């Protein structure tokens, strides 16, 4: 199962994304569920940079995992733009999870900084 997590800050705004696991919907190279989740996550990260000018901090990329978060301080305008992009990601992931509930688990969690 793919576990996708959207993270929110204390103010309720999206601050990061994580996905890991495999759907096993089909064999590697033919798994449309895995491809859908992957392209949504990568497109969000790329759009944050190319459209919004925000370079997300990539924490993990590879081995069936993608994890990134927004930089610590953004202008109100940049944060607004990031929320639009994350809204696209949220809607897309929700659609995939509803269509393939046995293959994708989507959750929204509070962002916890490691101390």
Task: Place the predicted regions along the sequence by residue.
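N-terminal intrinsically disordered, cationic/polar leader segments
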Residues: 1-32, 42, 46-115
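Short, conserved glycine- and acidic-residue-centered signature motifs
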Residues: 33-37
């Amino acid at each position: 199962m793919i576990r996708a997590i959207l993270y929110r800050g204390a103010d309720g705004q999206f601050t990061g994304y994580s996905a890991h696991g495999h759907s096993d919907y089909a064999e590697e190279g033919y798994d449309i569920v895995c491809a859908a989740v992957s392209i949504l996550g990568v497109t969000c990260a790329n759009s944050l940079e190319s459209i919004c000018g925000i370079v997300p901090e990539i924490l993990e990329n590879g081995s069936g995992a993608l994890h990134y978060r927004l930089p610590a301080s953004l202008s109100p305008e940049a944060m607004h733009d990031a929320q639009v992009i994350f809204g696209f990601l949220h809607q897309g992931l929700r659609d995939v999870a509803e269509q393939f509930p046995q293959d994708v688990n989507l959750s929204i969690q509070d962002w916890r900084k490691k101390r």
